[in-house]
Amino acid sequence: MKKVCVIGAGTMGSGIAQAFAAKGFEVVLRDIKDEFVDRGLDFINKNLSKLVKKGKIEEATKVEILTRISGTVDLNMAADCDLVIEAAVERMDIKKQIFADLDNICKPETILASNTSSLSITEVASATKRPDKVIGMHFFNPAPVMKLVEVIRGIATSQETFDAVKETSIAIGKDPVEVAEAPGFVVNRILIPMINEAVGILAEGIASVEDIDKAMKLGANHPMGPLELGDFIGLDICLAIMDVLYSETGDSKYRPHTLLKKYVRAGWLGRKSGKGFYDYSK
């Protein structure tokens, strides 16, 4: 594989684009508005500038990486790509439309991957005529730094597709794990209910935000407490994953806590909104 298209220029999409470009891949970064594309490219530029400042890369390397990334609002730019990674909003209807469009645009051998954190790869693949070439590639934030990629098979994903994506993940410095399709996959099925339980402990008045996080950092050796981590991920994303886990399994242990819903309804989404369980506006 030589050329990759990333659909969605938000934090995850931009990070994925940076990770590929840093390892020599030609990358197309696509979003629906020029302002979104420009914001994504600026995000990558700032990330690379920080690496230059820290002495981790040279200025010339930064320039080389940036020249490998082209931004666009034209989905047809994915036509000659070997791999397309969708990192759009976590809604099945939107993802299926994107994959249906890509199926018509891309060459027959192109692999179509989704960065979904919890949705069904099999259902996404049903929107295409190439379900054998549809797969999940779940990156973690920040994508240029985090080593893990969950590689998720849909019911029709071929071994050839899986092997190609695994090899490509290793080529960009990641350490992939193979995951059978299931709600939340591995990490989020364990992690998000833990965050939800921490919300419940807070709501019941058992401990404060700070003490809940301190307890898990000192008692379980977690680098970040569950409520701080929820703010980092985005409380809206945490809620969306809990909703998928609950609706898919019907298990009450995955029911999102009322307080989590209230925060999301209030627009208190964590770091990205300036307020979540902590105040980031200062």
UniProtKB/Swiss-Prot annotation:
PROSITE patterns: 3HCDH. It is an enzyme of class 1 (oxidoreductase). GO terms for molecular function: 3-hydroxybutyryl-CoA dehydrogenase activity; NAD+ binding. The keyword Oxidoreductase applies. Keywords: Fatty acid metabolism, Lipid metabolism, NADP, Oxidoreductase. Disulfide bonds: none annotated. GO terms for biological process: butyrate metabolic process; fatty acid beta-oxidation. It catalyses: (3S)-3-hydroxybutanoyl-CoA + NADP(+) = acetoacetyl-CoA + NADPH + H(+). Its EC number is 1.1.1.157. This is 3-hydroxybutyryl-CoA dehydrogenase. The lineage of its organism: Bacteria, Bacillati, Bacillota, Clostridia, Eubacteriales.
